[in-house]
Amino acid sequence: MGMLRTTSKFIFLSILLSFSSCNFIANYQIVGVWKATEIFENDKILKDKTLENIILQFNDEGNYSYEGTLNYKEAGKFKVSSNSLFLTNQLKEEKELHIESLNSKKLVLLMEDSGKTRKMVFSKTFN
């Protein structure tokens, strides 16, 4: 019985560590400067000449900044949990974005905006 209890505790701790290490890896991979390369709205690509002005930056202290079109800027704290990216701006407003894909070169985010699904594809420019 003692061996079974020890094994159960080990399995539980292993699962717990794997979840926390996944979040650590995602937080580590997202750190850097990301430039938008494509934007889709309801699966249709948007042709936008100002796409290169959209920049997302994440640092290893949990801070983010966003520069968009029309001189829109935002900054605050971020957190990655599972496949979600939580952004909390300086006014303490939180947004949740779905991470469709994240690796060392590409970030794909999904969000709902005015009842429309928006997909933003970013390419990493700096670590």
Give names to the regions the model predicted.
Residues G2-I11:
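Bacterial N-terminal signal peptides that target proteins for export
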Residues I11-F19:
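Bacterial N-terminal signal peptides
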Residues C22-A75, S81-N127:
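Lipid interaction determinants
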